Amino acid sequence: MDKVLNREESMELMDLLGLERAAWGNLPLMRKAYLKKCKEFHPDKGGDEDKMKRMNTLYKKMEQDVKVAHQPDFGTWNSSEVPTYGTEEWESWWSSFNEKWDEDLFCHEDMFASDEEATADSQHSTPPKKKRKVEDPKDFPSDLHQFLSQAVFSNRTLACFAVYTTKEKAQILYKKLMEKYSVTFISRHMCAGHNIIFFLTPHRHRVSAINNFCQKLCTFSFLICKGVNKEYLLYSALTRDPYHIIEESIQGGLKEHDFNPEEPEETKQVSWKLITEYAVETKCEDVFLLLGMYLEFQYNVEECKKCQKKDQPYHFKYHEKHFANAIIFAESKNQKSICQQAVDTVLAKKRVDTLHMTREEMLTERFNHILDKMDLIFGAHGNAVLEQYMAGVAWLHCLLPKMDSVIFDFLHCVVFNVPKRRYWLFKGPIDSGKTTLAAGLLDLCGGKALNVNLPMERLTFELGVAIDQYMVVFEDVKGTGAESKDLPSGHGINNLDSLRDYLDGSVKVNLEKKHLNKRTQIFPPGLVTMNEYPVPKTLQARFVRQIDFRPKIYLRKSLQNSEFLLEKRILQSGMTLLLLLIWFRPVADFSKDIQSRIVEWKERLDSEISMYTFSRMKYNICMGKCILDITREEDSETEDSGHGSSTESQSQCSSQVSDTSAPDSENPHSQELHLCKGFQCFKRPKTPPPK
């Protein structure tokens, strides 16, 4: 390069290129600077034209001289100019052709004498072995495999890598990786004549990205790049024999606690089990109902209005227990999934009970559930009035003769579930009380009401509601050919006639719900309510008993004057029917498992509701008055009447009836104080004299 340009020209060119003098001879760098200065000095770009011309002149001269200097000068000759071999002209041409060759190419071919002497001995000696070429490693040392990722084709991103290469390339890669990825930590370790680079990056990368970057710098040298699964364990192994540290970016290296972050405060998780227990205890089968009820528990117990009123036992009884869990539940993102699992648990438990428990045990469990509810709402923390429910008992007792026997017989029917003797029919005109009694029986036993008036193609999923139910009610079944033209026609009776296998209960039938598999089971027993439609004989044979209802004006008037019965749905409540059974039936009629609780409730009714009070309730019903419009007057003869047991109460009722059976001259039916409205007549109690 010193012969290309003289010193002044070379210095001038480097100044024009804007490079340091030490860069003279770095042709790629000079070429890059030349192109850059061309844009700067070009006249069209607003540059200096003189500098542009001078720089072009010097740079072109340098390029030309460098090209000539690198070409070997062998002389130029043409084959036609070579004279004939052997002539004097050829000898002179050959001499002139060889003048330019370097004399160093001359070789002395004389042999040393010592070589000749040693020839004989050397012929019988073994020639020296050639050095074997050392093969490059194919993988990391085997003792490090447990710390490395062995994935070959993976898009997984990591933040720790290990590179295995030659010692020379490792020195270059150590700096290049540090600059390229701004590594958090990097170290170089000796390994059997080669190097291993261990480094941590602040961001996650694919192994292929690290490998591609390193391959650009390792054209001939071997390179193995892998991700690290156990960072500190690998680093610790590289610091012990047979490895040792050459250099690292942090003095002292890494410590174990660098990879063990401080444990954050343990985040509280929602207790799915606690929510499931609440759903099972309350027998909640509605996902959204359970979701709404549980979200109400997140508010402070002391400020909760429902807990202060104590009118909802499923709330105030569980609020304090579930308060802490409800706060976490309110912030959860999978509330519906939690509630769905809880509801599924309730349905699963019901199915197990249906399979393993007898129907009598299931009814006893249902009675226990109702008694628990009665203990709550009629207890110290409840706000229900026992007299109002006993008013409902009196009203229902006036609905049918011997109502307690009717209910008892129906329970006997659904408990034993005898094939072809499982269904009752409630038939009567509008507002005769059949639906009221059916709703109460449904709530007493537990079950579902079904609409059988749908078209046959839609009836499949309606019947699927009866899966795992104790009983069903086919409500307000419509038919054709009614005597009254006011009654609408429908497909209900025809559909029921097509469901004889369902009503008989002799064989199992397939029931299905949407999004659920078919369930094969005996269809549950129950009852049917309808208006005065004609019933085919084939369907009539499926009913073990038919009760004809008739509307009673005094019941309607009494109900209108006692609005609390409708507002609180007392007449449709299973608690009312259970109180009716407790009031009229003997303890022996109940299951032995609940007889002790029945005795407690009989004693409570004796202490709070006297026979006089109950008789006044029935009298007000017959008069069409408000049932609780009772004048409280104390009299030893009437107030002492109480009924310590059901047998006693029955004897008192019979004595009361015997009073009414006196001759007509004493108590004629035409008198104002005597009532006979389609049930057992009784005499109005005499008004006791004042104290």
Swiss-Prot record:
Q: Where is this motif: LXCXE motif?
A: 105-109
Could you tell me where the Low complexity compositional bias lies? 645-661
Reaction equations catalysed:
Couples ATP hydrolysis with the unwinding of duplex DNA by translocating in the 3'-5' direction; ATP + H2O = ADP + phosphate + H(+)
Per its UniProt record, what PROSITE patterns does this chain match?
DNAJ_2, SF3_HELICASE_1, T_AG_OBD, ZF_LTAG_D1
Query: What is one term from the GO cellular component aspect held by the record?
Result: host cell nucleus
Q: Name one GO biological process term.
A: symbiont-mediated suppression of host type I interferon-mediated signaling pathway
Q: What is this protein called?
A: Large T antigen
